[in-house]
Amino acid sequence: LYITTPYYAVEESMQKSLCIAADAGVDVRLLVPAIPDKKFAYVVAKTYWGELLAHGVKIYRYTPGFLHAKSVMVDREVALVGSTNMDYRTFQLHYECGVLFYHMPVVEELLEDLDDIMAQSSLYTLEEWNRRSWLERTFASVLRLGAIWL
């Protein structure tokens, strides 16, 4: 299960679902930008990463530039590509669109693109997440209270 999104701030049910999948042995990967366009949204996104990492989710931060792609790849044979971010605003407020591909050549092409993105990304670790400064942790916790508005 590969998820590509520039913004990550989800409801607890989605967060838990990804953790449960990883606990069950599913290869769950989150591909995000290392260079954000919205700093506060990025700080909030990182508050979710610790739990994901603790459950074995791999988080790749794309380093060459801003990654604005939005896709979900399931079992290397189903892909969803569209305008859907993984955040509250998308799921509760906005009308988004996407195209679902199943057993089509474009799925393999997307998989190749995702492999390229991961090759150009740095793997973020739980150790890195735990090394965040006290100031960053505090600031992020306060910002997360307003995650539904970011």
List each language-model region with its residue ranges.
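PLD/PLD-like phosphodiesterase catalytic module centered on the HKD motif
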Residues: 2-3, 7-150
